Amino acid sequence: MLILGVESSCDETGIALYDSEAGLLSHALYSQVAMHAEYGGVVPELASRDHIRRVVPLLREALGQAGKMLDEVDAVAYTRGPGLAGALLVGCAFAEALALAIDKPTIPVHHLEGHLLSPLLSSDPPTFPFVALLVSGGHTQLMKVTGVGEYELLGETLDDAAGEAFDKSAKLLGLPYPGGALLSKLAEQGTPGVHELPRPMLHSGDLSFSFSGLKTAVLTLVREHADAMSDEFKANAARAFQEAIVEVLVKKSLKAMKQTGLKQLVVAGGVGANKQLRTTLNDEAKRKRFRVYYPELEFCTDNGAMIALAGCLRLQSGSPSKAAGSFAVQPRWPLMEMSVSPTK
């Protein structure tokens, strides 16, 4: 079964081909980061227009990489939500029209489910069940995953997501867009212990997160040093911020592992690429004897490969596809609303 995946939820356009037996055959990706950097963040209208420009060339690239013809595709999976409404509509309309043209069904996919399942693209994938830490610019959640579409929410952020806190704190430190990754690199140059920042909800007793207070603490720190914003200060502040957020993510994840009794942890989403987070979790995994899995770095950001994979696994788990032509997107779409509906 050959699945074509289309991703367009924000500022990356991705097209991929996934075979149920051979695995990932190709994936083509275009990032709009350079375009949005001029504005200091994603401009939704510009994102939508650029998706329109990129989808057809990327489709040709993906087909060429895989050595496949369009009529060999068995179904077209696409991101239905959550995300930017206009950006989602571009990918949705493209996928539905393409499927209609080749008389194949479509599979609407949840963007976060794509991230959640992306470690299954690796050569050493996790097996169900496992605990998942989803950390991105828009979401921070801990879940118990027992199968495709079988998700139990253990805890989530009550305000800002971890990735959002990274980006906003980077902006406070005067770093250009996209700031989160730059803050992480800057933190490597910082000295531990120079600044102390709060660990929000670290001892709350539950698995909820809150990062708005940490962002406010960075703002206060910056204001206190407004007359001495040296490179050294920025590096030390970045180090303090990253250590605080990583400690919270790690300790909450360990608590979820203990609470569920599971021995596998999946970390997915853009923040999952953070070096300090990975190093700390790997050390804890060795110490507490559990396994931790991450997507390949190229699949931490938004991509079509994870959408193609999720679509394929959805079909294999019994979720029905639908006839092409009619469609809708869901900019706001809680992952817990997803469920497997076995075909009769």
From Swiss-Prot:
Binding positions (substrate): L134, V135, S136, G137, G138, D167, G180, N274
A molecular function GO annotation: iron ion binding
Any Gene Ontology CC annotation: cytoplasm
Matches recorded under Gene3D superfamilies: 3.30.420.40
Keywords: Acyltransferase, Cytoplasm, Iron, Metal-binding, Transferase, tRNA processing
UniProt-listed CDD domains: ASKHA_NBD_TsaD_bac (cd24133)
Protein name listed in UniProt: tRNA N6-adenosine threonylcarbamoyltransferase
The organism of origin for this protein: Dechloromonas aromatica (strain RCB)
Gene expressing this chain: tsaD
